[in-house]
Amino acid sequence: MNDPNFLHAIILGIVEGVSEFLPISSTGHLIIVGELLGFSSVPGKVFEVVIQLGAILAICVLYSGRLTRVLRDAPRDAGARNFIGAIFVALIPAGLLGVLYHDFILEVLFTPYVVCAALITGGIAIVVVERLHLEPRITSVEAFSMRTALKIGLFQCIALVPGVSRSGATILGALLVGVERKTAAEFSFFLAIPVMLGASVVSLRDTWQLISMDDLHLIAAGFIAAFISALLVVKWLVSFVSSHGFTVFGWYRILFGSLLLIYFSLSS
């Protein structure tokens, strides 16, 4: 196939799958890569929503056994109920603020310079928190108290600022309240399922009519690319952070945000 947009759709799908669950901001990466590629065949918001669904499907597949077990055992197992309760409680703060300030976020905060500043600031925060060498006390989501979940949920509110990174804010909050690195990463994955599914349903409800039959092969290519790349990245991330931590992602954010800032300054 000689259609350059088909290749661009695959590239953007890979970018989404790689960056969605790393604490590096998928928004910032999709903005810059989409602009560099000049990808405009599919309405941007529609395409972004669909490839996010591909990334979420990867989490559901990878953790299908654990998620099924939690749902099955919830009536009789306290740990399973803790798991479900922690997800629900952590969703509340950002969910409320997101509804209240949705228009403000889109109209005021969704600018290249805000994204750059959020990338750099978030990177500095990750490096600083890792250098604190905090002693982890919580080693599984099933052991979360509702207070722990609420504190992490409050941190997730920061991710309403474009460029902060939903997974980055969740992981930072988890580390600060004593969650071990692997569990912090996994909680960010589990929390992403209802967050991104809900956001996708709302977005598709408002934009599905923009999809044409000519776009379907591009949407499918991006979806599959996001699914496969997310599968690989999530498996690697859990192993990597257990022994290396998140510092490298902090430095990457600082570098990427600085380069983006230079790029947008020169292009304007």
Swiss-Prot record:
List, alphabetically, the Pfam families matched: BacA
Classification via PANTHER family:
UNDECAPRENYL-DIPHOSPHATASE
Q: What does this protein do?
A: Catalyzes the dephosphorylation of undecaprenyl diphosphate (UPP). Confers resistance to bacitracin.
Any further remarks? Answer: Bacitracin is thought to be involved in the inhibition of peptidoglycan synthesis by sequestering undecaprenyl diphosphate, thereby reducing the pool of lipid carrier available.
User: Which Enzyme Commission number(s) are on file for it?
Assistant: 3.6.1.27
Provenance organism: Parvibaculum lavamentivorans (strain DS-1 / DSM 13023 / NCIMB 13966)
Q: Where are the transmembrane segments?
A: 42-62, 86-106, 108-128, 158-178, 184-204, 218-238, 246-266
- Catalysed transformations (reactions): di-trans,octa-cis-undecaprenyl diphosphate + H2O = di-trans,octa-cis-undecaprenyl phosphate + phosphate + H(+)
Biological process (GO) annotations held by this record are: cell wall organization; peptidoglycan biosynthetic process; regulation of cell shape; response to antibiotic
Regarding protein family, the annotation reads: Belongs to the UppP family.
Q: What is this protein called?
A: Undecaprenyl-diphosphatase
> What's any one GO cellular component for it?
plasma membrane
